[in-house]
Amino acid sequence: MFNVIANGIPGTEMPGHWFTDREIRQLVAFVRTLGRVAPQKATGDVVNGEKLYAGKGGCASCHTIGGRGGAIGPDLSDIGASRSLSYLRESLTSPEAAVPDGFLEVQLVTRKGRRMTGVRLNEDTFSIQIRDLSGDFRSFFKSELAELNKQPGKSPMPSYTKVFTQSELDDLVAYLDSLRGLE
């Protein structure tokens, strides 16, 4: 980030700036605080939450932590640094309440009758690329599709209210809150 501020981005309209090195370091430190939330005291058991994440919840089949896990859902490596305890709990109990940007669910049917649900990765006028619920990358020409239904506000993630007890939800929230990436 330091170099981008100091030198700009070649080939774009972002020029370098005349700030001193000290001012740039201060600016970088400030920008890194944006979007972060102050640590709150989670009431659950972090160790048990990690076990629930890896086991009973099956969370790692869709989410990534530290480069390991699935790719259907958001990377959770630093989720505790950017989301509050209430947001984390709501994402587990009502995942459709706040679907993260970049995770638009789509349902499609090919002209041959094949149905598929996934998360849109890219789309242009002629094609769409998705990651299906198995985690596989799929690409389609739109001319091959009989139906393409975008599902804004819908999430492939289920609600965990009937999967976990309240105590287990507390543990999982505590674990997610402990994930703060590289600090």
Segments the model singles out, each with a brief description of its role:
Residues 34-42:
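Accessory carbohydrate-binding/adhesion or oligomerization-edge regions at the termini
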Residues 1, 41-67, 80:
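Sequence/structural segment immediately N-terminal to covalent heme-attachment motifs in c-type
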